[in-house]
Amino acid sequence: MDGQELLRDKNKSAFKLNGLPHVYWLNLDADTHRRDYMESQFRYWEIENHTRISGFDGRDDDVSAHLKGRIPDNVSQAELGCCMSHLKAIKHFYEETDDDYCMILEDDVNLDIVRYWNFTWRDFFGLIPYDWDCVQMTTICTCLLYTSDAADE
């Protein structure tokens, strides 16, 4: 794709994100390549209202010091770190802003899916029930996933 095609592509899809709330994105301090990746996506999609939240690395950090009560047996340290990072972003949003809502992303999100939307952010937001508290948006991989069970068949 040459520069002109890239510009036309960008201008055709970036408008779909008009009205996007402030974006908080989770990123481990050591993952500078993911930080660069996210910052380049924000530039490409013309998203200026974003804040990086330094994440907890459950593989290296002892997150149990931040928790009360018993940690479930089937939760890994990495999952706890991810959960703690999300809670840190929510806390920052709650304590540091007067905004009504925000968006929280992990640093491996791929915003290219927006080009395939047949709606805008404002269209989507207008369809959320009036009494919502939290909305989870996710993209499910449509490819065949190989798990240990699938490999055994």
Predicted feature descriptions by range:
Residues 149-153:
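A short, hydrophobic C-terminal helix/tail in secreted or cell-surface proteins
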